[in-house]
C-alpha cells in the first residue's frame, strides 16, 4: 500500500510548497526535489503492487520505499510544527533556535534523499511500467440508511437446516451439535444468521445466543460471552468455576439455541470442557457451529456436518448484478457479457461475487470491466479457492484515497465490532484522509467509509444511539493483514496500544505492549496514536509533551488520574483527546485552549467542575461530548458560539446561566451537525431563569436525540414542536416537576421513544389538545411518577399510536391504560385497581411485568381473558395477594410464569394452571405462605423448568421421592429448589 501513502505525502508536500513556511526557513529547493522524486517513483507503483505478490525482491524494495516515505512524512510534520511555533513566538523567524533547527532538518533531508536515490536506482532492475492510478472515488450522493443486500440462493439450505433443528429438538435426549462446513466466503455465517432469525426457530428455542469464536477458543472467554448474551449486560471479571456455575443456572432446563460462528479449534479437550457445561439444557437444546475445517466438524458434531456448496452460476450472477448495477433498469449488454465472464472466475463464492460487483458498481466503461476480467492476479497461485485473487483485485481497483484507510483496519482483531466515528479519527491521526474542497475531514472520512461499505469491505452494520458500528468478514480482514506486511519495519512505529482488553492488535506500525511505563514514550518519537485506555494509570508523565507528531491520545477508563500535566498543551498536532470515564479527573490544564489542532475532546464520565477556559479558541473542535458551565468569564456558554460541533454534547450546570442572552450565545440553532443534545440543571428545581434560558437554547432542526434534566421552569419551550424537532427520534425529560403541561409530542413525525420522569401534579394527559397528534412513529413510551396522570390523550381517536410496542408506567396511580392494538410489552407498578382492569385493553400483549403498590388481595377475573397472545408473565411484590383468578387458564400461549415476593399467596389455581398448555418455565420465589403446588402441574407436558426458592412450606413438600408434592413435579426435567 506504499502507493497510497506516497500520495498522502505528495499532497502534503504540494500544499507545503505553496505556503509561506517553506520560504521563511529556506528549504524550498530540498522539498521540491523530494516532491519530484516521489512523483517519479509513484508512476510505477501500481505495476509494482501487482507484481510483488510473487516477487520477493520487489516486495523488499516496496518495504524500503515505504520506510523512507514515513521518514519524509516525519520530517515534514516536525518542520511544520516547529516552524509554526517559532513564528508564533515573540521572536518570530529570528528565534535563537532557528539556526540549529535548520541544521538538523538539512542533515535529515540529505540522509533521506540518499535513501530515495538508491531506491529510485534499484527500481530500474524490476522493469516496471508506468500506470495511472485513480486518485479518488467518483463523487455521488449517498444516504445515511445502510442495509445489507438481498441474500440469494440459500433458502433451500436454510429450510433444510431448520428442519434438522426442529426434528432433532423433538426427538433428542441430549445436546445436539450440527457443524456447517465450507470454505471461506461461501456464506456460512449468512446462512446461520438466516436460521437464527427464522420464526420457527424463535418459537421453539429460548434463549437464542450468538457467539463468534474465530481464533480464540478460550473456555472462560466463551462462557463469559454466552452469559453476557443471555443477560444482555456486561459481566465483571470472574474465575472459571463461578462462571461455569452461572451459565449452568441460566441454561438449566432450557431448550436453548447456540450458534458458535467461525470455529478453528482442533483441540478436542477444549471442546469437551465447554460441552460439559452446556449439557444442562433441556432435551432438544441445539448448537449450530460454522467452520472451514473438517476436523473441527468431526470433533464437535453429534450430527453429520452440513456441507455448504458453492452458489449456482445463476445465483452468483444475481448477487454480482445486485452489487454492480443496483436498481438500474437499463444495463449495457456488453457490460453484462463481460460481467458474466468475471462471475465465472468467482467460482460460485458469494463473497467474491459481492466484492467484485462492489468495485464495479460505479464503473461504466467497458475497458474498466475488461481490466478486472483480464487481470494477471487471476493467474497467481491459489490456496483454498478463487476467493483471494478476487479480493486482491478488489483492493487494486480501489481509488488511492481508500486503499490505506482499508488496510489500516487490520489493526483491529478479527470480528471486532468497530465504531465508524472512532475509525475515522484514527484515519485522520495517521494522515490518510486528503482534503477535498470545503469538506471537513470528518465528512471526507465518512465518504471514504461509505465507499468501502458499498464495495462490500464492511458488513453487519448497526446503529446505536446515533453511532454506527460494523465488522469485516474474516477473509477481508486477512486481505488487509496481508497488505499490511509492507509496514513491519520497527523504525516507524506510529501507534502503541497498551490496554488490557485486547481491543487492538500489533501489526505493522501498530505495537501492543503488555504494560505502560513513562520511558516507553522516549523510544517512539514518531507516534501518531497512543492508546492507554484502561491502563490503571495514576498520572501521565510530562514527557508526553515531547511527542510532537501525536494526533490521538486515549486515556479513557483511567479512573485514578486526577489531573493532566501542563506540557500536554504543547501537542500542537493533537486531534483527539479521549478522557471519558476518567472518574477522578476534576480539571484540565488551563492552557488546553492552545491545542490548536484538537478536533475531538471526549469528557463524559469525568468529574469536571467546569470546562477549561476559552475553549472557544479551539476552532477545529468538532466533537465536545460534555460542556460544564463555569461561573467565571471564559467558562460560559458563549465559548460554544463559533464551534462547528458534530455528534452529541451534554451541557451541564445550566443553573449558573442567569440571562437568556447568555444562553443565546451558545448558538445551538446554527449547529446543523449536532444529532444529540442533553441539557441539565441541578435537580433542586428552584431556578427562576430556567424558562427563558431553555427557550434561548433552541437547537437546529437536524437534532435526533434530546434530553432535558432538572428543568425548573413552569412550561417547556415553544421550540419543542414539529418545525424544530421534526427529525427527533428520542426525547427524555427528567425532573421537571414545575411544568404544568407537556408539548405536543404527538405531532413529531419521527419520534420513536418518549421517556417522561417525575412530572407535575397538574399534568393529567400526555397530550390534552382537542385535536391530539397521532404519535405516528412512537414505539417506546416510559412514564415515571406522574401522580395525577389519567391517560395518554384527552381526546382519543382510532389512529393514535399505530406502531407503539413497548410501554412502562411506574407510580402513576390515576392512569388508565387505553385500548391499543399494537402494544406487545408492558411493565407497570400498580397503584390503583383500575390499572389492573385496564390491562385487558392490550390484546396484542406478549410480555407483562406487574408489581404492586396498592395492597391488592386479588387480581380482577377479567384481567387475563383477552390476553390470548401473552407469552411471558411476571407478578412481583403483591404482598397481600392471596389468590389468582381462574382466568389464568385462558393464557394458552404462555411460556414463562414467574412469581416473586407475593408473601400472602397461598396457592395457585387448580383450573387456572391446567390451561397453561404451552408453559415451559415456572418460577416461584419468596412466596412464604405458599402451601402446596396444584395437581394440574402433572398435565403440563411442555413444562421443562421449575424453580422454587425461599418458599419454605412448598420446599418441604417437594422433597425428592418422599415429599407430598413430589409426584406433581417428578416429570419435570430441570428442577431448582432452594429453601
Swiss-Prot record:
Changing residue 166 to T: In susceptible haplotype. Residues 143-437 form the NB-ARC domain. Keywords: ATP-binding, Leucine-rich repeat, Nucleotide-binding, Plant defense, Repeat. Induction: Constitutively expressed. One of its GO terms (molecular function) is ATP binding. Belongs to a four-gene family located at the same locus. Although the four genes are expressed in the resistant haplotype, only RGA2 confers the resistance to P.infestans. In the susceptible haplotype, RGA1 and RGA3 are likely to be pseudogenes created by deletions and mutations, while RGA2 also contains several modifications. Disease resistance protein. Resistance proteins guard the plant against pathogens that contain an appropriate avirulence protein via a direct or indirect interaction with this avirulence protein. That triggers a defense system which restricts the pathogen growth. This is Putative disease resistance protein RGA1. It comes from Solanum bulbocastanum (Wild potato).
Amino acid at each position: 500500500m506504499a502507493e497510497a501513502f506516497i500520495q498522502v505525502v505528495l499532497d502534503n508536500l504540494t500544499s507545503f510548497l505553496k505556503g509561506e513556511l517553506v520560504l521563511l526557513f529556506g528549504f524550498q529547493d530540498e522539498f521540491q526535489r523530494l516532491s519530484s522524486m516521489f512523483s517519479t517513483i509513484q508512476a510505477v507503483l501500481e505495476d509494482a503492487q501487482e507484481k510483488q505478490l510473487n516477487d520477493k525482491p520487489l516486495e523488499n524494495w516496496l518495504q524500503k520505499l515505504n520506510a523512507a516515505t514515513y521518514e519524509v512524512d516525519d520530517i515534514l510534520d516536525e518542520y511544520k510544527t516547529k516552524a509554526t511555533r517559532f513564528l508564533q513566538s515573540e521572536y518570530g523567524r529570528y528565534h535563537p533556535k532557528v539556526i540549529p533547527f535548520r541544521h538538523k532538518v538539512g542533515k535529515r533531508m540529505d540522509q533521506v534523499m540518499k535513501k530515495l536515490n538508491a531506491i529510485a536506482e534499484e527500481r530500474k532492475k524490476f522493469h516496471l511500467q508506468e500506470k495511472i492510478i485513480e486518485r479518488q472515488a467518483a463523487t455521488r450522493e449517498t444516504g445515511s440508511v445502510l442495509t445489507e443486500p438481498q441474500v440469494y440462493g440459500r433458502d433451500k439450505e436454510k429450510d433444510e437446516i431448520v428442519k434438522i433443528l426442529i426434528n432433532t429438538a423433538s426427538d433428542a435426549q441430549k445436546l445436539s451439535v450440527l457443524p456447517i462446513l465450507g470454505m471461506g466466503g461461501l456464506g456460512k455465517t449468512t446462512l446461520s444468521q438466516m436460521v437464527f432469525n427464522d420464526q420457527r426457530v424463535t418459537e421453539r428455542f429460548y434463549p437464542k445466543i450468538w457467539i463468534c469464536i474465530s481464533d480464540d477458543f478460550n473456555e472462560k472467554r466463551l462462557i463469559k460471552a454466552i452469559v453476557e448474551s443471555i443477560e444482555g449486560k456486561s459481566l465483571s471479571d470472574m474465575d472459571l468455576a463461578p462462571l461455569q456455575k452461572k451459565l449452568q443456572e441460566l441454561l438449566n432446563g432450557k431448550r436453548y439455541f447456540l450458534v458458535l460462528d467461525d470455529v478453528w479449534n482442533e483441540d478436542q479437550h477444549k471442546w469437551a470442557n465447554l460441552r460439559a457445561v452446556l449439557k444442562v439444557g433441556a432435551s432438544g437444546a441445539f448448537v449450530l457451529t460454522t467452520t472451514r475445517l473438517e476436523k473441527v466438524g468431526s470433533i464437535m458434531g453429534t450430527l453429520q456436518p452440513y456441507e455448504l456448496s458453492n452458489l449456482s452460476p445463476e445465483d452468483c450472477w444475481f448477487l454480482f448484478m445486485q452489487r454492480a448495477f443496483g436498481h438500474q433498469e437499463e444495463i449495457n449488454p456488453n457490460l453484462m457479457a463481460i460481467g458474466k465472464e468475471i462471475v465465472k472466475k468467482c467460482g460460485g463464492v458469494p463473497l467474491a461475487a459481492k466484492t467484485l460487483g462492489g468495485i464495479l458498481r460505479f464503473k461504466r466503461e467497458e475497458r474498466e470491466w475488461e481490466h478486472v476480467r483480464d487481470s494477471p492476479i487471476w493467474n497467481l497461485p491459489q490456496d483454498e479457492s478463487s476467493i483471494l485473487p478476487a479480493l486482491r483485485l478488489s483492493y487494486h481497483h480501489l481509488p488511492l484515497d481508500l486503499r490505506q484507510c482499508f488496510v489500516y483496519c487490520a489493526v483491529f482483531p478479527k470480528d471486532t465490532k468497530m465504531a465508524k466515528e472512532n475509525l475515522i479519527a484514527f484515519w485522520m491521526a495517521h494522515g490518510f484522509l486528503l482534503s477535498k474542497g470545503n469538506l471537513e475531514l470528518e465528512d471526507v472520512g465518512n465518504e471514504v467509509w461509505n465507499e468501502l461499505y458499498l464495495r462490500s469491505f464492511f458488513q453487519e452494520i448497526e446503529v446505536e444511539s446515533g453511532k454506527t458500528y460494523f465488522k469485516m468478514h474474516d477473509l477481508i480482514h486477512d486481505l488487509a493483514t496481508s497488505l499490511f506486511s509492507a509496514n513491519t519495519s520497527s523504525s516507524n512505529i506510529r501507534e502503541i496500544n497498551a490496554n488490557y482488553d485486547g481491543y487492538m492488535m500489533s501489526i505493522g506500525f501498530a505495537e501492543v505492549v503488555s504494560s505502560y511505563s513513562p520511558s516507553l514514550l522516549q523510544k517512539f518519537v514518531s507516534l501518531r496514536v497512543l492508546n492507554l485506555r484502561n491502563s490503571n494509570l495514576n498520572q501521565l508523565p510530562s514527557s508526553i509533551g515531547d511527542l510532537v507528531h501525536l494526533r490521538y491520545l486515549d486515556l479513557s477508563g483511567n479512573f485514578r488520574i486526577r489531573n493532566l500535566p501542563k506540557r500536554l498543551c504543547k501537542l500542537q498536532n493533537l486531534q483527539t483527546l479521549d478522557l471519558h470515564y476518567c472518574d477522578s479527573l476534576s480539571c484540565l490544564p488551563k492552557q488546553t485552549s492552545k491545542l490548536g489542532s484538537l478536533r475531538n475532546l471526549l469528557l463524559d464520565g469525568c468529574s469536571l467542575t467546569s470546562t477549561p477556559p476559552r475553549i472557544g479558541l479551539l476552532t477545529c473542535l468538532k466533537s465536545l461530548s460534555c460542556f460544564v458551565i463555569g461561573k467565571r468569564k471564559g467558562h460560559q456558554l458563549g465559548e460554544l458560539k463559533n464551534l462547528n460541533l458534530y455528534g452529541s454534547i451534554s451541557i451541564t450546570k445550566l443553573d449558573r446561566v442567569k440571562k437568556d442572552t447568555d444562553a443565546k450565545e451558545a448558538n445551538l440553532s446554527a449547529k446543523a451537525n449536532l444529532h444529540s443534545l442533553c441539557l441539565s440543571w441541578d435537580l433542586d428545581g428552584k431556578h427562576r431563569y430556567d424558562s427563558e434560558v431553555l427557550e434561548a437554547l433552541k437547537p437546529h432542526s437536524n437534532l435526533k436525540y434530546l434530553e432535558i434534566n432538572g428543568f425548573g421552569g413552569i412550561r417547556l419551550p415553544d421550540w419543542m414542536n414539529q418545525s424544530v424537532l421534526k427529525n427527533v427520534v428520542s426525547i427524555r425529560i427528567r425532573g421537571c416537576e414545575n411544568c404544568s403541561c407537556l408539548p405536543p409530542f404527538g405531532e413529531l413525525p419521527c419520534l420513536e421513544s418518549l421517556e417522561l420522569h417525575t412530572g407535575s401534579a397538574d399534568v393529567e394527559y400526555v397530550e390534552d389538545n382537542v385535536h391530539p397528534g397521532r404519535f405516528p412513529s412512537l414505539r417506546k413510551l416510559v412514564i415515571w411518577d406522574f401522580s395525577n396522570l389519567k391517560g395518554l390523550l384527552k381526546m382519543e381517536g382510532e389512529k393514535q399510536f399505530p406502531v407503539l410496542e413497548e410501554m412502562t408506567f411506574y407510580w402513576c396511580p390515576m392512569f388508565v391504560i387505553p385500548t391499543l392494538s399494537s402494544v406487545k410489552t408492558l411493565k407497570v407498578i400498580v397503584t390503583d385497581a383500575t390499572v389492573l382492569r385496564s390491562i385487558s385493553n392490550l390484546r396484542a400483549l406478549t410480555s407483562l411485568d406487574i408489581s404492586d403498590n396498592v395492597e391488592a388481595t386479588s387480581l380482577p377475573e377479567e384481567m387475563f381473558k383477552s390476553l390470548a397472545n401473552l407469552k411471558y408473565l411476571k407478578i412481583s411484590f403483591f404482598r397481600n395477594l392471596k389468590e389468582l383468578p381462574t382466568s389464568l387458564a385462558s393464557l394458552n400461549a404462555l411460556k414463562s410464569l414467574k412469581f416473586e415476593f407475593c408473601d400472602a399467596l397461598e396457592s395457585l389455581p387448580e383450573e387456572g394452571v391446567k390451561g397453561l398448555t404451552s408453559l415451559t418455565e415456572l418460577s416461584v420465589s419468596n412466596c412464604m405462605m405458599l402451601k402446596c403446588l396444584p395437581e394440574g402441574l402433572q398435565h403440563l407436558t411442555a413444562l421443562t423448568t421449575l424453580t422454587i426458592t425461599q418458599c419454605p412450606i412448598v420446599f418441604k413438600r417437594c422433597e425428592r421421592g418422599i415429599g407430598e408434592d413430589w409426584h406433581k413435579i417428578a416429570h419435570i426435567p430441570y428442577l431448582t429448589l432452594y429453601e
